[in-house]
UniProtKB/Swiss-Prot annotation:
The lineage of its organism: Eukaryota, Metazoa, Chordata, Craniata, Vertebrata. It is found in: Mitochondrion inner membrane. This is NADH-ubiquinone oxidoreductase chain 2. Belongs to the complex I subunit 2 family. It comes from Petromyzon marinus (Sea lamprey). Pfam families: Proton_antipo_M. GO terms for biological process: mitochondrial electron transport, NADH to ubiquinone. GO terms for cellular component: mitochondrial inner membrane.
Length: 347
């Protein structure tokens, strides 16, 4: 295990890498920020000294190295042709497509998604939460910047494929971390489908996704539910189980929970672009994800053993105000949608 000082240093380094990518105006600085992120999370992933953790760390390093190498080569070619390192799409469609694929690989989108479930299953919930949320911010920032000049179909087709792969892949899983990995793949499909049309809404949906996913990971960490069968055996933390029910339904995008904001905004944006058939296919794919969310809810609540006495229930639990706040935001933010849109579209 890592000492608290080293762990805090690594977490601050993670934040530094993302901020470097956010504030960079050149490809070389953006690439350095991505590399700082990768180097900082590797010790966090391997801290348990378990063979599965080491295997997951190795797979993650190989996948990220391939994406970073491709991104650096395409950035060098762009600088060679344009004469500067400024973050701008390349005029060569082959270079632009390779750059987009490299960022999709780092995001874990289909068809470059194979590393994500295998890596996620070897991590603990907190490190998995960082991988599924914070590590997505820097690549999606770069993807949004080049998506405006990219061929729309080159982004929309992987986005649609991610929704179907995320839903289909999670159907036969029993590991909760693998289910959340496929959930992340499906959500990345919805988020990136808006990147060519509306960067502001793309950022809003990304932050909402990070909020709900973080709350779900923390809740499963509290319940120690590594497998979905463990959800039926938890007798003493029924409040967390009830909160998990709401969080899973919010991840599925059911109204009036917070997760419905992402589906609603994406549907409105795609409909405005006259992509009705594409939107219908995205909705059909999201039903697959909703099925395994509902199955987890069924196991968590319906199949839980009855408690005939209140002595088994920990009513006097330690106050956890941050967890309470993040859970409330993850489930009750839908009524604030007009205000969120007003804030994010403010120029």
């Amino acid at each position: 295990m890592l000492s608290p000082l080293i762990q805090s240093t690594l977490l601050m380094t993670l934040g530094l890498g993302t901020l470097v990518t956010f504030s960079s105006t050149s490809w070389i600085l953006a690439w350095i920020g991505l590399e700082i992120n990768t180097i900082a999370i590797i010790p966090l992933m391997a801290k348990t000294h378990h063979p599965r953790s080491i295997e997951a760390t190795t797979k993650y390093f190989i996948a990220q190295s391939a994406g970073s190498a491709t991104l650096l080569i395409t950035a060098c070619l762009t600088a060679w042709y344009s004469g500067n390192w400024a973050i701008s799409p390349s005029n060569d469609p082959i270079i632009l497509n390779a750059m987009t694929l490299a960022l999709m690989l780092k995001l874990g989108m289909a068809p470059m998604h194979f590393w994500l479930p295998e890596v996620m299953v070897g991590l603990d919930f907190i490190t998995g939460m960082i991988l599924a949320t914070w590590q997505k911010l820097a690549p999606i920032t770069l993807l949004i910047q080049i998506a405006q000049d990219q061929n729309n179909m080159f982004i929309l087709i992987p986005a649609l494929l991610s929704v179907f792969v995320g839903g289909w892949g999670g159907l036969n899983q029993t590991q909760t971390r693998k289910i959340l990995a496929y959930s992340s793949i499906a959500h990345m499909g919805w988020i990136t489908s808006m990147a060519p049309f509306n960067p502001t809404i793309t950022w809003l949906t990304t932050l909402i996704y990070c909020l709900i996913t973080s709350a779900t990971f923390i809740n499963l960490h509290i319940l120690k539910a590594n497998k979905i069968t463990a959800l039926t055996m938890n007798k003493h933390n029924q409040i967390s189980q009830m909160l998990l029910l709401l969080l899973l339904l919010s991840l599925g995008g059911l109204p009036p929970l917070t997760g419905f904001i992402n589906k609603l905004l994406a549907s409105i944006e795609l409909a405005n672009q006259n992509l009705i058939i594409y939107l219908f296919m995205m909705m059909m794919g999201s039903l697959l994800s909703l099925f395994f969310y509902t199955r987890m809810c069924y196991l968590s609540i319906i199949l839980s053993p009855p408690c005939s006495t209140t002595n088994l229930i920990l009513w006097r639990v330690v106050s956890n105000k941050p967890m309470t706040l993040i859970t409330m935001l993850s489930t009750n933010l839908f009524i604030m949608t007009p205000q969120l849109l007003a804030v994010f579209t403010l120029h």
